[in-house]
């Protein structure tokens, strides 16, 4: 059955529903119930030099208060509830901001506020928060979302090109080998991303070269290289990053081809010149060990400096042995038995020496020579400790006894009191005890068996004797005797002893008594005396000191060389290198497993000579090396290296002595207790002459030459010798004296003899000046003394450098008694004439007298002084008149009157007597002699006045005699010529 359609809603019902709906919408708009919502994390990407950020997920804020999409046709869309009004970024210095694109959907974007640089910062992290528009027209009741984290990465742009780390590269390879890698070139890129910052490839741009480069920059050869074909290759290499961007600047690579490798030391010079006074000099500054790429486990290198031919094994100070002991701090009392020959020590004059002063003076004993030491030089008490020191060079000359030092009976008996001798390669010291009440065996002979006794090298031997023990030091190393023989003490006698060096003195009885050496007989009282047991070898520096033993420090000081090898390596440069040095600094041993570190240590080895004036000459150097390899079968051998250090000749100092050479003193001063000072104004200086190169280039100007410049230097002196010239000093009436206390304060010793006095000791020139100022000469019998002459010579380094001979003549002024002044005519001739001659000789010299009241001038002295004064006045007047006459002559020649000055000089006689004003005074024989000389000079003037007048300029430069002649020639009136 058909149903009836439902009736439509009534209009009233429709109105009711609309009102309900409208009422509900108004309520919803009035309430902001929900907060906006964001994703917890966002990831973004932005390209540098751009500002748009691509986010994942997109930036959208949701709000449940938002109207549904199907309700968009209703009035609720005009309200603010549910809309997103903005985003807020939290963080410091964040170069981004967030912008709302659509408020209703909550969509937004993030963008950069400035251009970003990936090289400065690759990524950024910050938080963001969304907020809605609130409720009502005024936007109150705003709600914010939670904070979401945003990570943004800055994408790189390939804006930088690769750049090589080095401007150029160098390498060297050995010919004939295929190398897996010769060297590596490396470039870097400043871009920040791995894609653009990494170098993906290298390329050799130079065509047709036997080399290739891989992606890591390693260059290798593609074929074996030939040194004869090419010595060096030059390659141009470029680089590309992974973005295919090429380096803006290519790099130059130089590969040198070396000939076939030979292991050994390279980069050294066979000759090294050493300038004295320059300190340490590196001898191998560029040396390195070539191992030819062989694997090396360790290397040992030994550097030796050969100095055995210099002095006594090396360069040492060449002062006397006594001075050296004092410099090393030894106590006083050392007696030198082999001194350099001098006036005071003359017993070594006949011995052959090395004939040179550059090094130590050594004495040669050939088996037939010996020297007897004068009595009093050595005072030795065997009961007290004493020391014997000697330098010796001895070879293997068989098994005969050879005596170095021997003290034996002078006459009657052959007893040896003490002696030091060589027997084969043994050194024996004999010491017989003095007579005593106890007659029992005591140690008498001490034996040492040493190679140093007969190896023909210089060695230093020191015997410290303190009965009953004897200690021997050889080159500073102590040695105990291997055998000691005992014997009875000597029988008491009154026989004097004789000390001999180089042999032994004993009475010849016709039988050799076991002495193998042929005797050299000498006639003497008490029987035939002779020398026996002669020494064959060289000796130097033989000294004996009684009363005290030598200290070990003194022994080491005496032996220490002044030259040697030195190695000063920085702490960070000797890692893994072991260094050993000999006590003499002549041998250095280096060992290490790192060849590079060993090379650095070898480059720091230096030669040093601390002497101010070293001995010039060659010092040979030798390097011997031992290499240990991991594979012993294929280990390389390093040949030895030989060179030399040439020590150049030092600038020789010129020692100059200056002062007053000639002076006179009153006889009373000679006879006084103080005497007179011989060198009151002595000055000692030393200079050297150097060549100074000109500033201009000599090749440009051949006239420019090197100039010599003299420079004053300071050094020590070791000897000053004052000797008397003429007769020897007579100890009964004259002497040379000096204050001993002042000498000791200066460290200088004085030894007196009939020939003078010798000052010894290593001291400064100023100290010697002061000491010589103190030297005084006394003579308490001056009645017959007119003058005395002395000579002074100073030296350095035991006579190596000598000063000039400084001579002093001192005259005695004899004063007349008052009676003699009143009656001078009665003066004895033996007083007048000698004194008169002495004062004539003193003209032009210093006649200063520090005590004027102690001398009363004689009549002759007054007359001479007046004559000399008048003579000087005449010279001055003559020079003036000569110049005036010369000017008038020139004027006459200008007017044409050249003949007006001609005259007849045959009868012209001019006589000037400078003594005529003193005719009434008492005259001496000396005045008459002077007048005769003046008259003879006048006669010569009469012969040629015109010639003298034309040579007036020469007369002005002449001596007093010439000036006097000129004065007399002009004592006339040139208008009338009448007298």
UniProtKB/Swiss-Prot annotation:
GO terms for cellular component: cell surface; endoplasmic reticulum membrane; extracellular region; glutamatergic synapse; Golgi membrane; membrane; neuron projection; nucleus. The chain crosses the membrane at residues 860-880. PANTHER family: CALSYNTENIN, CALSYNTENIN-1. This is Calsyntenin-1. Proteolytically processed under normal cellular conditions. A primary zeta-cleavage generates a large extracellular (soluble) N-terminal domain (sAlc) and a short C-terminal transmembrane fragment (CTF1). A secondary cleavage catalyzed by presenilin gamma-secretase within the transmembrane domain releases the beta-Alc-alpha chain in the extracellular milieu and produces an intracellular fragment (AlcICD). Beta-Alc-alpha secretion is largely dependent upon PSEN1 and PSEN2. It is found in: Postsynaptic cell membrane; Endoplasmic reticulum membrane; Golgi apparatus membrane; Cell projection, Neuron projection. Gene3D superfamilies: 2.60.120.200, Cadherins (2.60.40.60). Residues 925-959 have a biased composition (Acidic residues). Keywords: Calcium, Cell adhesion, Cell membrane, Cell projection, Endoplasmic reticulum, Glycoprotein, Golgi apparatus, Membrane, Nucleus, Postsynaptic cell membrane, Repeat, Signal, Synapse, Transmembrane, Transmembrane helix. It comes from Mus musculus (Mouse).
């Amino acid at each position: 059955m058909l149903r009836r359609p439902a009736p439509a809603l009534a209009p009233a019902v429709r109105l009711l529903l609309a009102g309900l709906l409208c009422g509900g919408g108004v309520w919803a708009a009035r309430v902001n119930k929900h907060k906006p919502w964001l994703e917890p994390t966002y990831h973004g990407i932005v390209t540098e030099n751009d500002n748009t950020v691509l986010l994942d997920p997109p930036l959208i804020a949701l709000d449940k208060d938002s109207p549904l999409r199907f309700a968009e046709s209703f009035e609720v869309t005009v309200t603010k509830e549910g809309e997103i009004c903005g985003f807020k970024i939290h963080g410091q210095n964040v170069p981004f901001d967030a912008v709302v694109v659509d408020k209703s959907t909550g969509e937004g974007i993030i963008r950069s506020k400035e251009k970003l640089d990936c090289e400065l910062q690759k990524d950024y992290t910050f938080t963001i928060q969304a907020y809605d528009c609130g409720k009502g027209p005024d936007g109150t009741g705003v709600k914010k979302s939670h904070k979401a984290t945003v990570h943004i990465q800055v994408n790189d742009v390939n804006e930088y090109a690769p750049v090589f780390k080095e401007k150029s590269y160098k390498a060297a390879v050995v010919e004939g080998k295929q190398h897996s890698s010769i060297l590596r070139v490396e470039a870097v890129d400043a871009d920040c991303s791995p894609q653009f910052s990494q170098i993906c490839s290298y390329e050799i741009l130079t065509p047709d070269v036997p080399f290739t480069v891989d992606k890591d920059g390693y260059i290798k050869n593609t074929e074996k290289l030939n040194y004869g074909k090419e010595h060096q290759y030059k390659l141009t290499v470029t680089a590309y990053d992974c973005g295919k961007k090429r380096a803006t600047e290519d790099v130059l690579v130089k590969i040198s081809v070396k000939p076939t490798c030979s292991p050994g030391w390279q980069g050294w010079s066979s000759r090294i010149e050493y300038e004295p006074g320059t300190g340490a000099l590196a001898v191998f500054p560029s040396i390195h060990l070539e191992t030819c790429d062989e694997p090396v486990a360790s290397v040992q290198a030994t550097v030796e400096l050969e100095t055995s031919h210099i002095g006594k094994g090396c360069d040492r100070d060449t002062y006397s042995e006594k001075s050296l002991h004092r410099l090393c701090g030894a106590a006083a009392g050392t007696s030198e038995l082999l001194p350099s020959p001098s006036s005071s020590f003359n017993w070594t004059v006949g011995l052959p020496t090395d004939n040179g002063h550059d090094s130590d003076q050594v004495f040669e004993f050939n088996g037939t020579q010996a020297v007897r030491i004068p009595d009093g030089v050595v005072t030795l008490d065997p009961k007290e400790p004493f020391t014997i020191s000697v330098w010796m060079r001895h070879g293997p000359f068989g098994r005969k006894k050879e005596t170095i030092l021997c003290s034996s009976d002078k006459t009657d008996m052959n007893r040896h009191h003490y002696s030091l001798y060589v027997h084969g390669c043994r050194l024996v010291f004999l010491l017989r005890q003095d007579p005593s009440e106890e007659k029992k065996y005591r140690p008498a002979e001490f034996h040492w068996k040493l190679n140093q006794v007969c190896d023909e090298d210089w060695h230093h031997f020191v015997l410290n004797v303190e009965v009953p023990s004897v200690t021997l030091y050889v080159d500073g190393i102590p040695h105990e005797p291997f055998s000691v023989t005992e014997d009875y003490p000597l029988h008491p006698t009154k026989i004097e002893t004789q000390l001999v060096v180089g042999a032994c003195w004993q009475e010849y009885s016709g039988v050799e008594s076991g002495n193998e050496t042929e005797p050299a007989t000498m006639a003497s009282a008490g029987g035939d005396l002779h020398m026996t047991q002669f020494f064959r070898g060289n000796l130097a520096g033989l000294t004996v000191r009684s009363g005290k033993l030598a200290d070990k420090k003194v022994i080491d000081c005496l032996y220490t060389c002044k030259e040697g090898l030195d190695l000063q390596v920085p702490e960070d440069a000797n890692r893994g290198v072991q260094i050993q040095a000999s006590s003499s600094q002549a041998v250095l041993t280096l060992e290490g497993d790192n060849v590079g570190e060993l090379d650095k240590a070898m480059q720091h080895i230096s030669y040093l000579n601390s002497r101010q004036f070293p001995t010039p000459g060659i010092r040979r150097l030798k390097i011997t090396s031992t290499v240990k390899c991991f594979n012993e079968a294929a280990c390389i051998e390093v040949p030895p290296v030989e060179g030399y250090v040439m020590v150049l000749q030092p600038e020789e100092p010129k020692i100059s002595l200056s002062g007053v050479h000639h002076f006179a003193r009153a006889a009373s001063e000679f006879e006084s207790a103080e005497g007179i000072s011989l060198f009151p104004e002595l000055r000692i200086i030393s200079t050297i002459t150097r060549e100074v190169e000109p500033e201009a280039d000599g090749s440009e100007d051949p006239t420019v030459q090197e100039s010599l410049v003299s420079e004053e230097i300071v050094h020590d002196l070791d000897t000053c010798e004052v000797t008397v010239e003429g007769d020897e000093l007579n100890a009964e009436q004259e002497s040379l004296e000096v204050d001993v206390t002042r000498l000791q304060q200066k460290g200088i010793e004085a030894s007196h003899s009939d020939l003078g006095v010798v000052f010894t000791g290593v001291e400064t020139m100023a100290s010697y000046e002061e000491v010589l100022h103190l030297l005084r000469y006394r003579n308490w019998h001056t009645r017959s003394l007119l003058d005395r002459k002395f000579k002074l010579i100073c030296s350095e380094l035991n006579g190596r450098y000598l000063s000039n001979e400084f001579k002093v003549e001192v005259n005695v002024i004899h004063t007349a008694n008052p009676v003699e002044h009143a009656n001078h005519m009665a003066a004895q001739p033996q007083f007048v004439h000698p004194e008169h001659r002495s004062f004539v000789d003193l003209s032009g010299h210093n006649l200063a007298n520090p005590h004027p009241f102690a001398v009363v001038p004689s009549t002759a002295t007054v007359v001479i002084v007046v004559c000399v004064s008048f003579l000087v006045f005449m010279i001055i007047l003559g020079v003036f008149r000569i110049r005036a006459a010369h000017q008038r002559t020139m004027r006459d020649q200008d007017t044409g009157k050249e003949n007006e000055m001609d005259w007849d000089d045959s009868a012209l006689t001019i006589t000037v007597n400078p003594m005529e004003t003193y005719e009434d005074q008492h005259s001496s024989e000396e005045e008459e002699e002077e007048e005769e000389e003046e008259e003879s000079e006048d006669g010569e003037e009469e012969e040629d006045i015109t010639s003298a007048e034309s040579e007036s300029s020469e007369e002005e430069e002449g001596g007093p005699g010439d000036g006097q002649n000129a004065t007399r020639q002009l004592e006339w009136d040139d208008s009338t010529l009448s007298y």
